[in-house]
């Protein structure tokens, strides 16, 4: 079992039961899934640009990404409906906890001038979004083998009803808020 999941079961659940006065253990919020997305704008002109992003994302997440396509055509961007413009991965279960553990304890501390993640990035429904400017903060990525520095978005979807509950859950998991 993942280390973060063990911590969640042993320490976080009892602490949150006490703090938010839940009647039932099933009411305690948990992380449902983590979606990692890379948008590759240059894939419009150069479809080969997507291969590097797919490769990076599969190394970071440990599973094969799905290629995302444009929903509608936008003439200003020379974009047609159905063109491949990025890739994403949805992590659940053990892989999700492993990824979160690596993100919180290894990757985020490697960001330059890092002072913590923004506490305002909750969506009002208990989900947290985080943008990462470069994929090189992950230890799995070999700096010499990358073709280009890319950013990625990480969305942590929780079962929390409010932002306050989700913030408490992520903070007790070790997410470094400012």
Swiss-Prot record:
Keywords: Ribonucleoprotein, Ribosomal protein, RNA-binding, rRNA-binding, tRNA-binding. SUPFAM superfamilies: RL5-like. InterPro entries: Ribosomal_uL5 (IPR002132), Ribosomal_uL5_bac-type (IPR020930), Ribosomal_uL5_C (IPR031309), Ribosomal_uL5_CS (IPR020929), Ribosomal_uL5_dom_sf (IPR022803), Ribosomal_uL5_N (IPR031310). GO terms for biological process: translation. The keyword tRNA-binding applies. NCBIfam families: PRK00010.1. Belongs to the universal ribosomal protein uL5 family. Part of the 50S ribosomal subunit; part of the 5S rRNA/L5/L18/L25 subcomplex. Contacts the 5S rRNA and the P site tRNA. Forms a bridge to the 30S subunit in the 70S ribosome. PANTHER family: 60S RIBOSOMAL PROTEIN L11-RELATED. This is Large ribosomal subunit protein uL5.
């Amino acid at each position: 079992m993942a280390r973060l999941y063990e911590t969640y079961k042993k320490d976080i659940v009892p602490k949150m039961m006490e703090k938010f006065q839940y009647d039932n253990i099933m009411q305690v919020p948990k992380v449902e899934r983590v979606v990692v997305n890379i948008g590759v704008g240059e894939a419009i002109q150069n479809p080969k640009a997507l291969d590097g992003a797919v490769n990076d994302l599969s190394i970071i997440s440990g599973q094969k990404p799905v290629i995302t396509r444009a929903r509608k055509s936008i003439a200003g961007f020379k974009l047609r409906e159905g063109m491949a413009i990025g890739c994403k991965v949805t992590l659940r279960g053990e892989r999700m906890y492993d990824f979160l553990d690596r993100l919180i304890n290894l990757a985020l501390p490697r960001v330059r001038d890092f002072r913590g993640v923004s506490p305002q990035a909750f969506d009002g429904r208990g989900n947290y979004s985080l943008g990462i400017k470069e994929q090189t903060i992950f230890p799995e990525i070999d700096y010499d083998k990358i073709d280009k520095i890319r950013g990625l978005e990480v969305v942590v979807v929780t079962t929390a009803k409010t932002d306050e509950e989700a913030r408490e859950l992520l903070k007790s998991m070790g997410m470094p808020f400012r």
